C-alpha cells in the first residue's frame, strides 16, 4: 500500500541518528544556553534583517524565536518554537520529522534516537 507522505524520501540515510525535540521546552533551553539551535536562528534572523533592513526589533531578546519554523519532511506539519509539539531532527538541524511520521517510518528508515540534551549541549553549528 502506498503512503501519500512518501515522495522521494528514500534518499534519506538509513540508520540516521535523530534527536527528539519537544517544543516549547527545546526552544527555552536553546535560548537560555545560546546553543547551536539558538545560534542557527540568530544567524538566519541577522541575515534577514541585513537583507531587508526590516525586523531589527526581533533581534532583541526572545523575540528572535519568531524567525524560525520548519515542516515535517513527510507530511509538512509545521513546527514552531512556541507551539506544543514533538519533532525529531538530524544533528545538523536540517531535517525535521513530526512524531506521527517518526512513529510510522522509524522502522523503514532504521532511525536511532539520541537524547536531545546531547544536541542542545553543543554550541557550534556548521
Regions found by a protein language model. Give the residues of each.
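Canonical RING-type zinc finger of E3 ubiquitin-protein ligases
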Residues: 80-92
Amino acid at each position: 500500500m502506498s503512503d501519500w507522505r512518501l515522495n522521494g524520501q528514500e534518499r534519506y540515510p538509513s540508520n540516521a541518528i535523530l534527536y527528539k525535540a519537544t517544543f516549547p521546552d527545546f526552544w527555552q533551553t536553546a535560548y537560555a544556553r545560546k546553543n547551536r539551535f539558538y545560534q542557527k536562528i540568530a544567524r538566519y534572523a541577522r541575515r534577514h534583517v541585513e537583507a531587508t533592513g526590516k525586523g531589527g526589533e526581533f533581534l532583541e531578546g526572545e523575540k528572535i524565536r519568531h524567525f524560525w519554523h520548519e515542516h515535517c519532511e513527510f507530511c509538512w506539519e509545521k513546527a514552531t518554537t512556541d507551539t506544543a509539539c514533538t519533532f525529531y531532527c538530524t544533528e545538523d538541524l536540517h531535517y525535521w520529522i513530526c512524531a506521527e511520521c517518526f512513529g510510522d517510518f522509524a522502522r523503514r528508515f532504521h532511525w536511532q534516537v539520541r537524547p536531545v540534551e546531547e544536541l542542545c549541549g553543543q554550541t557550534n553549528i556548521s
